[in-house]
Amino acid sequence: MARSISSQGLLSRRRLLGASAAFGAAAVLPGAFRPLTVRAEDVTLTLVAYSTPREAYEQLIPLFAATEAGTGVTFEQSYGASGDQSRAVESGLPADVVAFSLEPDITRLVKAGLVDETWNTDEYKGMVTDSVVAFGVRAGNPKTIAGWSDLVREEVQVLTPNPLTSGGARWNIMAAWGALLKQGKTEDEAKEYLKQLFQHVPVQDKSARESLQTFIGGVGDVLIGYENELELARENGEELEIVIPAETILIENPIAIVNTSANKEKAQAFIDYLRTPDAQKVFGENHYRPVVKEVLDTFTFVNPATLFTIADLGGWADASTKFFDPDNGIVAEVQA
């Protein structure tokens, strides 16, 4: 069973009987005359996540519920901009499992005592999916966008979300910065590039999903975003093309258990399930790059000429302050 909620209030409520998707069992609908009987072993987990994996989790939750470990487990779900979701949990939004866009949104909860310091010591370093930063362009690529230099041409408008709220926006900025360095530019030249880039951004939405909707609505020539988000939009019939720049960053998406969970064993079972080949295949079918190599190898993804990681740029501990300090960071400086 799954219910979708928002950290700012109820957005939608959905009742999904865990195994019904797999076995066609009848669901008890809200308002039915017969009360739902809850077994003593049944538990509810709350998943608080960033916006883009919603479709994947709505497929995975009933599949987990159909496993022995997931028997009797129902879910409440909350999706939104990664930074906003992390701050909401820090401020008291109930959560058992958090799945965010980037590591600093977990680190915030570690500092608050809400996530164990050992959250990223497993073989996957706390990650559940990967992706890359890509460009979405209009059908036919009328602006002939091929690489980062094309985004600052005079006639080009670019969409990227707000880095104060969106994890995806931070990945985009680090991708641009790293690409310039990989091209042999200096940090001063990379900073000047970011300044020019933001001059081409007409609107900064709160999340990657909202930024995609703005692009679909006709604003902008290029959308910088998650490869998986762009692929999903194209699969759903949106008229866009995807460009993988020669230099881009590997996006690494973390997941963790919240210490205040009353059901840590089931929460861990859910995370363990998400790293099984079956679950990773579902992520791959939703255009994420699986973190389980044997599953990754069964998919065909475009391999950029130069793929770098956040570790290559000094890691998030350094980047969070250097780039995203709201008063003194590089992003604040180039947008002043």
Language-model segments: what does each one mean?
Residues 62-69, 152-209:
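Ligand-binding cleft/hinge of the Venus flytrap
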